[in-house]
Each structure stands twice: as structure tokens, then as C-alpha cells.
């Protein structure tokens, strides 16, 4: 949200005390900026004492967002796991499904998911908040900076990608089957390195991005993330005869 549109909408909502934002059915029709996890974080971590006030508008609004997010999470899980859900379409891709023409298209989509998620972590969650210099660093550009979860979010993202890459029958196993073990080993080593280095930081990312002494470590982390993304996109994908598809982070 480079232009702060979401925060302006939230400020207006607080000013107007819009009751339609406190009911799940009407909240679901509103702008994403008024009902996403960023909005919930703002409600909880900006003036948290207000949440304790009886009949607090902020509390009712936060509860409505939480309920809506729970409903959306349940829908997402069901869409993935039901008998004819997305997981089943992926597993049966070799026989052609509505989602995938064949197993190669399915595998290509998952390479793309790995690459695009790594790019989001590198560019949006770290590089952009850091700026080109310490003086240009912007803490407010960090994901969940109010709750100081920025580092933990990146760790969880990377652990998920690592598990996805190394799962039995996944990309790591496939690389070994085509005699490309060195690339599998290199990717696993980079995953381990970036996760370890993130977890080793003693200060929150909200402090580190503006800390001159931490700059070199953060830049090394960026380089390792870039190396991992490049390895998967330009080497591993070719090893497996795959071509990453459309990347939503590319803009146009």
C-alpha cells in the first residue's frame, strides 16, 4: 500500500463509526483494505487499550474482521482438501483436470509459486523497507511492523517453501532422479542459510532496517535470497524441463 490508501480508509471508518463494518455480511462487501489482516493488526496494536472499553466500536470492528478471516480460511482449506478440490486436481494432473492440462503444467505452476513467493519475500518484505541507504529505510513498509512480526513472518514463509521443496516426491527428489543432485543440495543449503541467518538476528527487523551496523548482514541476506530465487528459476526449472509461468509480482 505505497500510497497509504488503506490507512486513510481506516481513519475515515473510525471517524464515521460505520456500523456496517461491524457485521460480517456487510464487511465482506467492503474494500479489502478495511477487512484484511493489516486492518486487524492496526485495530489491535494502535491504541490497544480502546479494545477493553465496553461497547468499543474498535473492538466490534476487530471481532468482525477476525470472524471474516476465519470464514475465509475455512473456505480456503475446504477448496484445497475436499475430494474434488484443488489438491486432488494437482495429484491427478497427469490425467488432465480443469486446473491443469498435464503433470508438466502442474509442476510448472508450482515452480512459479516458489519463485514468486521468494521474490515477494526479497523485494516487498525486505528490500523495499531497507531502501537504498539507511537514511532511506522505512520501518512502516515492513509487513506487520506494528506487531513486530516482520522477521517471524519471513521465517515462516521460508520454512514453508523449504518444506514444499524437500517434501517426499517433490522437487528435491525429482532433481536427484534426473542426476541433478548438486542443484538440489545447493537449494537446500541456501534455504538453511537464509532461515538460520534470519533467526539469528537478536533485534526485530523494525530496528535492523535503520541500523547502520546491521546493514551488511541484511544485504548478505538479500543476496542469498536472490541467489536462491535465481537457482530455482534459471537452473532447477531447466533441469526438470519446466518453464515458470506468469509472475503476478511483475506488474503488467
Identify the function of each model-found stretch.
Residues 1-252:
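Mature extracytoplasmic or organellar-lumen-exposed domains after removal of signal/transit peptides
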